[in-house]
């Protein structure tokens, strides 16, 4: 299990950007592979520190992590963190560029894919049985309709950055034989700046609003299923493609039924007389129909009755599971004097044939201890 990112960097959850940067620099210097050659534990720690800082230094990724933890980044969710070449080099050069140098070509700036979003939805077992179409409202970042996502005021366009001349990188001499190359501080590596920002989105190219979406929940869907809605995540930056929306489904526990795959289980109490003499009872299945279950005489507590085809539908398949009814024989309570007399009389006239399991059990137990004591 991954360690908490805040604990990895030894900072509080309220740490600001300056504290995060300071903590990262200290720990990265301590565990850098060049300072710990051959130390696999140090290398592993160094990767964990990098991943934690790459996530927490980005406001959007940090917000997603604070809300969902590591689950926000599983299978494409949220940040694209980890020990990858591009993300790590940007972080390391931004902080250690003045002492480490390097001439790595920055990956192309400009268009950026929008972040993936997560939406938690709880449905009932009945809704899982029938399927449903749900209307949800999702707060998200959408492309600004005023500037069409460019961030520039309508009628104007982003211009080439005068500091890096569109390269996104700047180079400076260290005073010796080497020079260092760093992300351009003016355009943040994009190669362009916005002189006249859009007034509606303040130059961001995106706006935050709540969107209404229709989600199809197919019949037979199981607890923990994830539904991906491609392109329904946050809008991309500067014309980049949108992210995806992931619906995480949970099924509310049912009062009467438990589910195991496509099968359903239900426990039904029956009276002692029904179990002894036989009888029947009715159960209402998930499809709303009444089904009568016959109880043969001498039924024991725990016996199961199988109702074929009365379980859950199999997702996107024609098959249907079964419903298993387990009876629990209820011992009478609060007996009247007459009821007690009748039971006492029944006890007197009963034989081992009426209770073969208990009679046989105690006989075997007696034989065991007699043999054991010899």
UniProtKB/Swiss-Prot annotation:
HAMAP family: DnaJ (MF_01152). It comes from Chelativorans sp. (strain BNC1). The J domain is necessary and sufficient to stimulate DnaK ATPase activity. Zinc center 1 plays an important role in the autonomous, DnaK-independent chaperone activity of DnaJ. Zinc center 2 is essential for interaction with DnaK and for DnaJ activity. One of its GO terms (molecular function) is zinc ion binding. It comes from the Bacteria. Belongs to the DnaJ family. Pfam families: DnaJ, DnaJ_C, DnaJ_CXXCXGXG. Homodimer. GO terms for biological process: chaperone cofactor-dependent protein refolding; DNA replication; protein refolding; response to heat. PROSITE patterns: DNAJ_1 (PS00636), DNAJ_2 (PS50076), ZF_CR (PS51188). Binds 2 Zn(2+) ions per monomer. A zinc finger (CR-type) spans 131-210. PANTHER family: CHAPERONE PROTEIN DNAJ, DNAJ HOMOLOG 1, MITOCHONDRIAL-RELATED. Residues 4-69 form the J domain. It is found in: Cytoplasm. This is Chaperone protein DnaJ. InterPro entries: DnaJ, DnaJ_C, DnaJ_domain, DnaJ_domain_CS, HSP40/DnaJ_pept-bd, HSP_DnaJ_Cys-rich_dom, HSP_DnaJ_Cys-rich_dom_sf, J_dom_sf. Participates actively in the response to hyperosmotic and heat shock by preventing the aggregation of stress-denatured proteins and by disaggregating proteins, also in an autonomous, DnaK-independent fashion. Unfolded proteins bind initially to DnaJ; upon interaction with the DnaJ-bound protein, DnaK hydrolyzes its bound ATP, resulting in the formation of a stable complex. GrpE releases ADP from DnaK; ATP binding to DnaK triggers the release of the substrate protein, thus completing the reaction cycle. Its cofactor is Zn(2+). NCBIfam families: DnaJ_bact, PRK10767.1. One of its GO terms (cellular component) is cytoplasm. The keyword rRNA-binding does not apply.
